[in-house]
């Protein structure tokens, strides 16, 4: 893969990802940017931690296998509504499913080799694995009422887009670390430069 090509949304597009979330309108405008920054930072810090733990490995199939997570491929173009899905991480089954036809379309659109595209998608899913196995769900760092009737609020829900923003940040930061475009500060796996 070209060292300059990275097909996931960057930090500058993270707010757009948040705007697409159905709960976006429930977040006060003055808090939106801060929520995005926090989710992005969680992904960056997790990437630094994992990069050091894996000693810079960039083979996410092997990283998953080392953690007892199976990676399966289904030969489908998985589209629901207007959304194309490339993969799923099922924590209860400890399995990642890759949707081959969807990935091939995405790889072609982004001038990527199929295996490189799979690895990038697996890096994104690895963040979701981390969320379910110690990191905590990024979608819950900010919660909004499920239902509001006048001044009465019922229930609380997280913001799914924050988890996706964290996963994009993880994949982006890990990619940059592997390609020597970023580094973790010495002595601290918790901070990236």
Residues covered by each model-derived region:
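Metalloprotease/metallohydrolase-associated module, dominated by Zn2+-dependent proteases
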Residues: 5-7, 11, 57, 103, ...
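Active-site scaffold of zinc-dependent metalloenzymes
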Residues: 72-119
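N-terminal leader/presequence regions that precede the main folded/catalytic core
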Residues: 1-70
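Catalytic Zn2+-binding segment of zinc metalloproteases
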Residues: 119-121, 125-141
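Long alpha-helical scaffolds
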Residues: 43, 86-88, 167
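Short capping loops/turns at secondary-structure boundaries
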Residues: 112-123, 156, 160, 164
């Amino acid at each position: 893969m070209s060292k300059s090509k990275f097909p996931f949304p960057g930090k500058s597009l993270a707010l757009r990802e948040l705007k697409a979330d159905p709960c976006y309108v429930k977040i006060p405008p003055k808090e939106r940017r801060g929520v995005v920054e926090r989710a992005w930072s969680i992904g960056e810090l997790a990437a630094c931690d994992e990069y050091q733990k894996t000693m810079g490995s960039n083979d996410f199939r092997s990283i998953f296998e080392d953690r007892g997570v199976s990676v399966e491929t289904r030969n489908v173009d998985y589209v629901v509504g207007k959304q194309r899905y490339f993969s799923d991480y099922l924590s209860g089954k400890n399995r990642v499913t890759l949707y081959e036809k969807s990935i091939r379309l995405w790889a072609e659109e982004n001038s990527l080799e199929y295996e490189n595209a799979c690895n990038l998608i697996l890096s994104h899913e690895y963040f979701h694995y981390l969320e379910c196995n110690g990191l905590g769900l990024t979608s819950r760092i900010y919660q909004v009422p499920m239902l509001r009737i006048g001044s009465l609020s019922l229930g609380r829900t997280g913001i799914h887009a924050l988890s996706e923003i964290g996963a994009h940040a993880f994949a982006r930061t890990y990619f940059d670390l592997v390609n020597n475009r970023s580094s973790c500060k010495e002595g601290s796996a918790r901070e990236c430069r």
